[in-house]
């Protein structure tokens, strides 16, 4: 099993690489790429951790050496949010970065499962899809926008609010990965009831949690460590699916034939081909149905931005 992390010298990339070095199955290869010259050194640093995961780092303009033979590619390359920015402000820089990296993926490892972490995810996944289509290698079951951070935040905040063991909290988060497009389905959380006020405030906190971190770091960064953990959880689920483990389900932003938009975050069953099955997200409350319907213009606009960027 070979996993490549593109953007591995950044805050998310380094955290993700550390977690993968400690969690990937024995005999795996972990390949780190970043434009930054420090990247081979990050790999050397991580190589001193005693796990049976072989690690190599590559720097420079061309990610190709890192991508050869990759089964899973996780892309976190790009600039991070600063106070006053929202995820869409990142578009101007990150769109080109994702396009260039995916062009290399299309040539070097077109069958790899690709997880896009780089924001704005609503748009960068659409960019990736268009690039892969142009190259004639697009497989909708192998491309994912990583929205796991919205899920782990939801689990954490619910557990805190209700005094639960967070390991027992399961919640689907649907829609997209920015602001109003993030929709936690709180009505489905088992064994818990929320007042209308709790639903409204919890939904808002989950939607704005990224901004909470950006402001708390006071210009010193964005949510890198929690995102690293979320990306590792999702990446490990991809790996476990590829290895044939049963019942691996995660929410992800995918081209899953949704009635709502071309790309939509919902639960997917993972397996040897990436997505084995897009799962229904179930019954929703009136509040959730309204929130879902009112986000769709925003979501579709984000997607169109990505499609138009490549065309």
From Swiss-Prot:
CDD domains: MDH_glyoxysomal_mitochondrial. Keywords: NAD, Oxidoreductase, Tricarboxylic acid cycle. It comes from the Bacteria. NAD(+) binds at residues 7-13, 34, 94, 117-119, 227. Pfam families: Ldh_1_C, Ldh_1_N. Substrate binds at residues 81, 87, 119, 153. The active site is at residue 177. Signal peptide: none annotated. The keyword Protease does not apply. It catalyses: (S)-malate + NAD(+) = oxaloacetate + NADH + H(+). GO terms for biological process: malate metabolic process; tricarboxylic acid cycle. Its EC number is 1.1.1.37. The keyword NAD applies. It is an enzyme of class 1 (oxidoreductase). InterPro entries: L-lactate/malate_DH, Lactate/malate_DH_C, Lactate/malate_DH_N, Lactate_DH/Glyco_Ohase_4_C, Malate_DH_AS, Malate_DH_type1, Malate_DH_type1_bac, NAD(P)-bd_dom_sf. Catalyzes the reversible oxidation of malate to oxaloacetate. Belongs to the LDH/MDH superfamily. MDH type 1 family. Homodimer. This is Malate dehydrogenase. It comes from Shewanella sp. (strain MR-4).
């Amino acid at each position: 099993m070979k996993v490549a992390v593109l953007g591995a010298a950044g805050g998310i990339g380094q955290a993700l690489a550390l977690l993968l070095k400690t969690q990937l199955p024995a005999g795996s290869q972990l390949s780190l790429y970043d434009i930054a010259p420090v990247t081979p050194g990050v790999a050397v640093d991580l190589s001193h951790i005693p796990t049976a995961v072989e690690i190599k780092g590559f720097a420079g303009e061309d990610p190709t050496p890192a991508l050869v033979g990759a089964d899973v590619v996780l892309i976190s390359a790009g600039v991070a949010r600063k106070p006053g920015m929202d995820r869409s402000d990142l578009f101007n820089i990150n769109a080109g970065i994702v396009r260039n990296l995916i062009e290399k993926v299309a040539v070097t490892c077109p069958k790899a499962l690709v997880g896009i972490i780089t924001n704005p995810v609503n748009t960068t996944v659409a960019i990736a899809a268009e690039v892969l289509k142009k190259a004639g290698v697009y497989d909708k079951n192998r491309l994912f926008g990583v929205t796991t951070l919205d899920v782990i935040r939801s689990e954490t905040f619910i557990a805190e609010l209700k005094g639960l063991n967070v390991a027992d909290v399961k919640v689907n988060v649907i829609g997209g990965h920015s602001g109003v497009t993030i929709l936690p389905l709180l009505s489905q959380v088992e064994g818990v009831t929320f007042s209308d006020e709790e639903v409204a405030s919890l939904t808002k906190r989950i939607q704005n949690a990224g901004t909470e971190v950006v402001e708390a770091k006071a210009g010193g960064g964005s949510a890198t460590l929690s995102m690293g953990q979320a990306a590792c959880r999702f990446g490990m689920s991809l790996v476990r699916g590829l290895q044939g483990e049963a019942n691996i389900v995660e929410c992800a932003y995918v081209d899953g034939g949704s009635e709502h938009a071309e790309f939509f975050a919902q639960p997917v069953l993972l397996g040897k081909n990436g997505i084995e099955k897009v799962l229904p997200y179930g019954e929703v409350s009136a509040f959730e149905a309204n929130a879902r319907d009112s986000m769709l213009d925003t979501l579709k606009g984000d997607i169109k931005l990505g499609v138009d960027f490549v065309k």
